[in-house]
């Protein structure tokens, strides 16, 4: 597998661990001392606003499992990435990607069955987040791991 494809695979595994809220899978993608910084990208003063930071593989794994909002029954999220810009220099790489997160909620099937004429997917898909991921990766024993991740959201956050 080429280095470019290998670092793309790290991003693909990242978004899947995010969608599943799988802390173990998420943690396995990061170096032990990795950092995640999360910003609101469009603050009125033009400067990104820091809204969160995680330090260390274990903290990142724990946050994925315990701090991300769980999916409701019949619910899911889909973290779609696009527009990847990849730079590889030896055992270091940078991946800059656009993202959009959708929340998916399937309708409950009525006890009497779907109404006459109902066809296709039953439920809603709503965009809830958008922004950019910048991953700095390092190759360790032949495996690409995330050393730092910057998440820049295009929408403000309330906690």
Please report, for each region that a protein language model flagged, where it lies by residue:
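A solvent-exposed, acidic/Ser-Thr-rich amphipathic alpha-helical stretch
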Residues: 23-99, 105
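Short, surface-exposed alpha-helical recognition segments that flank or form part
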Residues: 2-5, 55, 121-125
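Short, low-complexity N-terminal intrinsically disordered segments enriched in polar/charged residues
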Residues: 1-32
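A beta-strand edge to alpha-helix "cap/lid" segment located at domain peripheries
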Residues: 69-159
């Amino acid at each position: 597998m080429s280095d470019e494809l290998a670092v793309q695979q790290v991003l693909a595994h990242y978004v899947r661990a995010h969608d599943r809220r799988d802390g173990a899978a998420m943690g396995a993608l990061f170096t032990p001392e990795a950092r995640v910084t999360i910003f609101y990208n469009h603050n009125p003063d033009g400067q990104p606003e820091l809204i969160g930071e995680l330090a260390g593989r274990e903290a990142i794994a724990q946050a994925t499992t315990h701090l991300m909002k769980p999916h409701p029954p019949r619910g899911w999220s889909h973290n779609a990435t696009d527009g990847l810009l990849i730079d590889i220099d030896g055992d270091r790489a940078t991946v800059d990607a656009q993202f959009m997160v959708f929340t998916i909620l399937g309708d409950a099937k009525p006890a009497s069955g779907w109404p006459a004429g109902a066809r296709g997917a039953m439920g809603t898909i709503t965009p809830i987040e958008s922004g950019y991921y910048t991953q700095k990766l390092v190759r360790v024993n032949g495996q690409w791991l995330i050393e730092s991740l910057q998440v820049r959201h295009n929408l403000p956050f309330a906690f």
